[in-house]
A protein has these predicted regions:
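Positively charged n-region of N-terminal signal peptides that target proteins for export
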Residues: 1-4
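Sec-exported extracytoplasmic/periplasmic mature domains
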Residues: 42, 46, 75, 91-95, ...
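Bacterial N-terminal signal peptides
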Residues: 7-16
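Electrostatic cytochrome c docking/interface patches
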Residues: 20-40, 78
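The canonical Cys-X-X-Cys-His
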Residues: 37, 41-51, 104, 126, ...
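Sequence context surrounding c-type heme c attachment/ligation sites in exported
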Residues: 35-43, 116-117, 134-135
Length: 135
């Protein structure tokens, strides 16, 4: 392969990769039913927290701080699920002091952009799902 042909080929590959990355960045979030806690977890949380909510999702290795094991929330809180605090955290109203700056996306903003009147139902459904998977 000549140097010119190789250069053209490399430029085309680079352009295709850049276009694909831009398309991925602009891909809309999957919509879920407001009452579907497991579906919301799968669509919005599992990439980092993992399908089993153990903090081992495929994106976890790319993060500077390891995602929490969400099956142990109650265990870390004296055996009681802190529902109000979890709901405020999901909605982006509170931060977890141990995390320092907030790395987790604030889903309340996403939920409000979908249908403002369903935010409380969405937050409750996701909180109920997290409560249901406690060990």
């Amino acid at each position: 392969m000549t140097r010119f042909t190789f250069s053209v080929f490399a430029a085309l590959l680079l352009a295709a990769g850049t276009a694909q990355a831009q398309a991925i960045d602009k891909a809309p979030m999957k919509r879920t039913a407001a009452y579907d806690g497991p579906g919301m977890y799968h669509n919005y949380c599992s990439a980092c927290h993992g399908l089993g909510a153990l903090g081992d999702g495929p994106a976890a290795k790319a993060l500077t701080k390891a995602p929490a094991d969400l099956t142990r929330i109650s265990a870390r809180n004296g055996g009681t699920f802190p529902e109000t605090r979890i709901k405020r955290y999901i909605e982006g109203l509170d931060e977890v002091a141990a995390h320092g700056s907030r790395d987790m996306p604030m889903w309340g903003e996403l939920f409000r952009s979908m249908e403002r009147d369903t935010v409380p139902l969405r937050v409750q459904a996701l909180s109920d799902f997290l409560k249901s998977i406690q060990k």
